[in-house]
Amino acid sequence: MSNKFVVIDLETTGNLPKKGDKIIQFGAVVIENGIITERYSSLINPQKSIPAFIEELTGINDEMVKDAPLFAEITEKVISLLDGAYFVAHNVLFDLSFLQEELIQAGLEGFYGSVLDTVEMARFLFPTADGYKLTDLAEKENLQHDRPHQADSDAQVTAELFLILLERLSSLPLVTLRQLTHLSGGLKSDLQQMLGEIMANKDMNTEELPDAIEIYRNLALKKLTPLVDNKEADKIDFQYPSKEEEKIEVVNQGFEFFEKRTGQFRMMDTVYQAFQNDKHTLIEAGTGVGKSLGYLLPAACFSKQTKVPIVVSTHTIQLQEQLLKKEIPLLEKILPFKINSVLLKGRSHYLSLEKFSQTLMDENDNYDSTLTKMQILVWLTETETGDKDELNLSSGGFIYWNKIKNEAPIFSQKDMWQEKDFYQKAKRDAQAADIIITNHSLLLSDIKGEGSILPAFDYVILDEGHHLEKVASQFFGHSLDYLSARLMIGQFGLYEQKQLFYEMEGLLAAIPRQKGKLLHTFELNQMVIDLTYEMDEFFKLIAVYAKAKQTNKKGFNRIKVRFSHGDSGKERNALVHSAERVAFLLKDLHSAIIDRLESIKTAKGTLTAAKENKLEELYIFGAELAELRNTVIKCFLKESKDVKWIEMDTRSPQNITTFLAQPAFVADQLKEKFFQVKKAVVITSATLTVNHSYSYIMKELGLNADATVQQSIPSPFEYKNQVQLFIPEDLPAINSVSLDEYVIAITEHIITIAEATKGRMLLLFTAYDMLKKTYELIKESGFLNEYVLIAQGITSGSRTRLTRNFQRYDKAILLGTSSFWEGVDIPGEDLSCLVIVRLPFSSPEEPLTEAKCQIISEQGGNAFSEYSLPEAILRFKQGFGRLIRTEKDRGLMIVFDRRIVTTKYGKAFLKSIPSVPVKNGTINELVELIHSWL
């Protein structure tokens, strides 16, 4: 193997060398025997103008390159650098394609040596990294990266990253390296020779495995540490600290500088009493109360004293991770006993080692499957949970995960991986746990009586409890979407596509045939063709129905259309007939597959482990097919009280639609199946009350006011001194103008405000279409070119990634919709200005909103005051909560929607947030306020 690596980075005028794009900067770092021995960089004259966006990205302009050499003038140097070396780059095919083109144009041979891609290597060697951009990886590994998108800086950082990747590769167990080598032929990177040398080195020096690693059935795994159930053995001489001075003494041990929070102590007592007295309890705790510790401390004390588990359920993964990794360790510092805690998820979140080990033998892999297998091989040396949420999977990786996820076996089989199984370990740990952390959906699966991972429990804390009603509605409902249905049928495939169908026929061919009973392969193949066609037509007809019934003519691209059983139009009739045909074909295909599987099963004793696993996979596919048919019938062919609707983007191909069915209200189900069977449920959130009353949330959840404790704990922050609320007078009333006119008016204000605040601004929208139009208009205006605009749904990345990027830049503006109204935590000066573009009422055309309002009106109620207004107020409170995250923050909140002061109900919004100074005025007065306040 060559011990010389040349790490190259290029800046270019665009992405297409064959279409005339050129190199404008060349950077190279040479590594020999693990040490950087040379650096070389040069600007290049591209002999064409550098586009404005490239200049903005790289900082390189026409003036800087006009006297630089042509690429042809540095080819001799480039060739000497690459002589006998590996070509290494971050996304190697991009840099290589430009280099080849330039070398060929200079009359030379291209580079035909070995290549290594650091993106690809990082994907499998850092399987849990947040992202694989160079900036993300540099941040992860604490590498100095001051000048991204400059070739010399990028090449240096890529070289440092490459050395770290080599070190990680060398540290892997020999058995893992052998498996990676076997798979590496399917990659872009030429890894085999290098892996061979690393393995030879390990062979020669007789490998010593780290203590934390074990080899089991030819897989290197991290040793798992089971939770030890000490409930019966524990003799804890510790009482709950009921007095304030006792709490101070206990909590003080966890903090270097402890500041007493009276609200937090009140919360502790309320939670402890709820469990002691078996009382359902609602606690609204304002920002800064210290909610997590406020419920965890009494929960831990109660659990230890009574030897019963407490289930803590949250809505977001982010909060679950925070509880497990930050709050529980803090709790263990301040309490004199060990707390057994476990994070539980649904079964399909856990890897099946049995299935994974079998798929390692499959030969017909695509690129994504190969890379995901390599990712998982490395991850198995690190993970203690086998939870897929730890992994950063590609979209193709998620498809592969479906083959290896943990599922209940359809027919009994001997599982040789039982003692190492991640799901079984999670179940065992749950039995030993004092505190079980989970999510609302898994909590509800316990209600539904689905084989839950949760042990028996009577005491629950629901954090982010305002989400429970929405999660329950989704949980008790059904959904059908084109991509999932198509993917499922695609997994089975046609015979010639060599997917599950082909593999099933292979199993069948190996056993004696039962004459006349089974369909011919050709007939089954035709059935799959018919079903695929009918499924396409079915989803096209869903789209036709949606477009025909669409009443929203405001130019929105994303539409939601209610599907009514009372409708007798031709579009509905065509759709129902299509659903009947799909259900019929699904039934036939399911029966034909099960007949075949039952035949194969008769020879079960003669099947190898691999064939038995394939049979299991086929049975699971059959169950999924039956479930799909069941959903089609429930959604289209059976009368039900569920609200049914269609969601689609009018710009997408016409069959890419989603059909949903959900109950309008879930209060009765929650009351009967949850609140009446649990001894004490504590529901907490920063947003439970409307106008200081809990009646709305209690009605939504089916709670009895007389039997429920209600406790409000205000935030310790001094909002009067920390926040100013401003309402511009010179904007049009939102319902008096068209969407486009309103967007033009607010965009002018946004530009003026941004220039005054120097960015540091979060804009909250209620609809994506308005966000998109505003973003495009700001961009077109050119007034904010020096600001970084980050927009949900436009800028790529998760909410966490977008928030992090917003905090990274001095002059940044973040535009968000639904999920940004809550759960975004941007403390300090990073966020100084919050703009609420319109009051967050759900559209009356939103199917669930329309159905709820209809039912309330039919029952003689007032839909606006009983549902639409309280729901909007809770969302408004969540939005307000984004601005002030610590006692030192200061900020300005601007509400563009003048209904907050021009309508009677507007006052209810202002009453529901802490008391702050409210000012009305023109944009000029607002700018003056910004300068004096911020």
Where are the regions that the model predicts?
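Conserved non-catalytic scaffold segment of RNase H-like nuclease domains
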Residues: 1-114, 127-149
